[in-house]
Amino acid sequence: MVKVGDKIKIIYMEGEPQYSGKTGIVELIDDIGQIHGTWGGCALIPNVDKFEIVEE
């Protein structure tokens, strides 16, 4: 399960192909579970978008 502070890599974001391959840090998980972070203006939607936690 992803949490605030995790580094993630976006594999696929529905309707936003330019985000594929971007990495960023999770800054906020909102009340409906969307994941916001440093990769740009769009939130990730669990069970729709694909991403992985990057282990450092």
PLM segments and residue spans:
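Basic/aromatic-rich interaction segments and small domains that mediate binding to polyanionic partners
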Residues: 3-56
